[in-house]
A protein has these predicted regions:
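A glycine-rich, hydrophobic loop/mini-helix early in the fold
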Residues: 40-64, 68
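Unchanged
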Residues: 39-42, 47, 73-159
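Acidic, metal-coordinating catalytic segment for phosphate/diphosphate chemistry
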Residues: 8-42, 48-49
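A short, amphipathic edge element
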Residues: 1-7
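Generic C-terminal helix-cap and adjacent flexible tail
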Residues: 170-173
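Short beta-strand micro-motifs in enzyme catalytic cores
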Residues: 16-20, 65, 115-117, 138
Length: 173
């Protein structure tokens, strides 16, 4: 890929947007607005009873409360695992002894340069959550059957939660 030009159009503390012009390896010219993001860590926390911890919060773009795996963005210079440990403690109050990477993926590669990494977190101890000032988070433990019913019924619609749950069923149990 050959980048011809990149012009930053917008920037805040979460992401930036640039207009880019490039030529792909086959010679095809591409012009696109790209959302740049440091990446996110997603935590699939499983307790000794094989229940999975989900958080519920209002998601403005979806105009709805969503049940989802806890997650958060990587701070500058932070690894996905460091972010996962920090975010799990902040959002849920939980700490994990054991961490295993389940998968890394691009949630929307057509225009967003964000990578998400999902970690399995086990050996949990519970504490007090310390969410950010702009976060209102409810937590609840779900059985695998409850999550499957939630996905099938359309009550769980978050993509990272579905991907994490499916990957856990494949390799994490």
């Amino acid at each position: 890929m050959k980048l011809i030009s990149s012009v930053e159009k917008y920037k805040n503390n979460l992401f930036s947007v640039s207009e880019e012009h490039a030529v792909d390896p086959s010679g095809f010219e591409i012009k696109r607005a790209i959302v740049h993001h440091n990446g996110s860590a997603v935590m699939l926390a499983v307790d000794d009873r094989k229940r999975i911890l989900l958080v519920r919060q209002y998601r403005l773009p979806a105009r709805s409360y969503l049940w989802e795996l806890p997650a958060g963005k990587l701070d500058q210079g932070e690894t996905p695992l460091q972010a996962a440990k920090r975010e799990l403690a902040e959002e849920t109050g939980c700490h994990a002894k054991h961490w295993k990477k389940l998968v890394t993926f691009y949630p929307s590669p057509g225009y967003v340069a964000e990578k998400m990494t999902i970690f399995l977190a086990t050996g949990l101890t519970e504490g007090k959550a310390q969410p950010m000032e702009d976060e209102r988070i409810e937590t609840r433990w779900f059985t695998a059957q409850e999550i499957e019913r939630g996905i099938q019924s359309g009550k769980i619609v978050d993509a990272k939660t579905m991907i994490g749950y499916c990957r856990w069923k494949q390799v994490g149990r």
